[in-house]
Amino acid sequence: MLIDAYGRRISSLRISLTNRCNLKCIYCHNEGEEDSGSEITVEEVAQIARICARYGVDKIKFSGGEPLLRRDFDEILRALPPMRDVSVTTNGTLLAARAESLKESGLDRVNVSLDSMDRDRFTFITQCKGQFDKVLDGIDAALSVGLTPVKINMVYLKGINEDEVDRMIDYVRGKPLVLQIIELMNFHGAFKYHADVASLEQRIKEKADKAVCREMHRRTKYYLGGAEVEIVRPIDNSEFCMNCNRLRITSDYKLKPCLLKNDNLVSVRGLSDAEVEAVLIKTVGAREPFFKSETAKVCQPYKIYEP
């Protein structure tokens, strides 16, 4: 296992496969990445997954950009070592045609971005015409082949889709779908669309039949008459950092210890397995919460438990 100096065990990888996207969403921050022009290869994904698996990492999420733009995504999935959970976050526009093959290649589930059930609003948000029905078809395809639960990511946007929450809840009700209502983060001036989710969460809480708190994010899942709903707040808090168990890999094959920082990326491109392993151990050892207090630190060196 890999455990950093703050007692956080790394059990999950988040791998960005590309910076490219076929939509132009008005709020997109591309996970803080800059275009490098050199995408991570199948062999590189397999290498980092194989090495991390030796240390107890058993969960991988792929993201982008739009990861389904990678024509070799099926090959990437087949190159992975056994994992407890393999998922992808996608805009869904290319999912219908690929859902079955992705499932057969080892994908377990999908997150699909769907910010509006209104066609015109969807077009405004994505800045692309003719994509709305493709996303709905993609969700249906994911359900039909068992890429479940399908998580529906709805970014809550001021003056745009605030009135659609009930409609979205109705959409997921009674299906293996989970609605994630996401509070907008402040990236690249998009904060003009920010809408506070506090009052919304209180309203959902009052209607809920049951509420369950998830450990990592201290995020509550609400159950409302056959619908599952989560409120996802910006991760600018020490509680999220305290429970972070993820190591991120950029689309140009760099280790990214913290989602909110880009000044400590570590390239492992062109290295042997032994060299990558050594860099991985060192990177985890230097890993720190972005939001922290001095009293939060565990007074011991990082721990490496040999596989």
Swiss-Prot record:
What EC numbers are recorded for this enzyme?
4.1.99.22
* A Pfam family assignment: Mob_synth_C
- Binding positions for [4Fe-4S] cluster 2 per the UniProt entry: 241, 244, 258
In what residue span(s) does the Radical SAM core domain sit? 5-227
Catalysed reaction(s) here are: GTP + AH2 + S-adenosyl-L-methionine = (8S)-3',8-cyclo-7,8-dihydroguanosine 5'-triphosphate + 5'-deoxyadenosine + L-methionine + A + H(+)
Name the positions where [4Fe-4S] cluster 1 binds. Answer: 21, 25, 28
The keyword Cytoplasm appears for this protein: no
Specify the enzyme's EC class, one word. Answer: lyase
The free-text note explaining how the cofactor binds reads: Binds 2 [4Fe-4S] clusters. Binds 1 [4Fe-4S] cluster coordinated with 3 cysteines and an exchangeable S-adenosyl-L-methionine and 1 [4Fe-4S] cluster coordinated with 3 cysteines and the GTP-derived substrate.
Q: What is an example of a GO molecular function annotated in this UniProt entry?
A: metal ion binding
Would the keyword Transferase turn up in this protein's UniProt record?
no
Which GO biological process annotations does it have? Mo-molybdopterin cofactor biosynthetic process
Instruction: Kindly list the positions annotated as binding S-adenosyl-L-methionine.
Output: 27, 65, 113
What pathway is it annotated to? Cofactor biosynthesis; molybdopterin biosynthesis
- Give the InterPro entries listed for this entry: Aldolase_TIM (IPR013785), Elp3/MiaA/NifB-like_rSAM (IPR006638), MoaA_arc (IPR013485), MoaA_twitch (IPR010505), MoCo_biosynth_MoaA/MoaC (IPR050105), rSAM (IPR007197)
The entry's function note states:
Catalyzes the cyclization of GTP to (8S)-3',8-cyclo-7,8-dihydroguanosine 5'-triphosphate.
What protein name is recorded for this chain?
Probable GTP 3',8-cyclase
Source species: Methanocella arvoryzae (strain DSM 22066 / NBRC 105507 / MRE50)
The gene designation is moaA
